[in-house]
């Protein structure tokens, strides 16, 4: 198993420790993703991977994170790579023909109930991200496009859908329960604001 360098880890609270365990599991899976064009440079960019994933998880509560950790451990026991699956689900939108022929038969099937919950969460996350974009357009201009899949590019919305489809029903329900009542204009609790604040702090900026 490939491990994250301990020197770069934020480890101030029990939640930080939980997030670090999750990132270790994801990093090992990310390292093992195979690409048709060969190994991607980002697979060796440990710092950026750590910052991006830690920032995302900083916006989630411990109950949801604990459930997601169990999803990762279950996948590990079954010999599944949830990061590979995430990219596979995204290809339903970026390369539908390849997805239908090569990936759909081998990816874990997503039930109609799970599909509906994924869509509800992804749309909430899109609303949160739009609120951040409206507040900080110059900063958001450096991020993924919000929607669409032009020229094979994965938007924020499609990336969210791909990742959410790898989560268990239990984890999705905990996720939805956490974010369903948040006002997108509430900068303290809107997860997009939390994520971006955490990211900028890693790079030495303060809001």
Task: Give the positions of each predicted feature.
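Composition-driven low-complexity repeats that form or flank extended alpha-helical/coiled-coil segments
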Residues: 2, 9-10, 205-206
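Terminal low-complexity "docking" segments
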Residues: 5, 9-42, 47, 51, ...
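Intrinsic-disorder-associated interaction segments
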Residues: 11-18, 22, 46, 58, ...
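Exposed alpha-helical structural elements
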Residues: 17-21, 64, 82, 171, ...
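A cross-kingdom feature marking solvent-exposed beta-strand/loop segments within repeated
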Residues: 36-60, 66-71, 82-84, 148, ...
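Short, structured motif recognition centered on aromatic/hydrophobic residues
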Residues: 57-60, 64-73, 117-121, 164-167, ...
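Repeat-associated, polar segments at repeat-unit boundaries in modular proteins
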Residues: 65, 70-111, 179-206
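Surface-exposed interaction/gating patches
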Residues: 113-165, 169-174
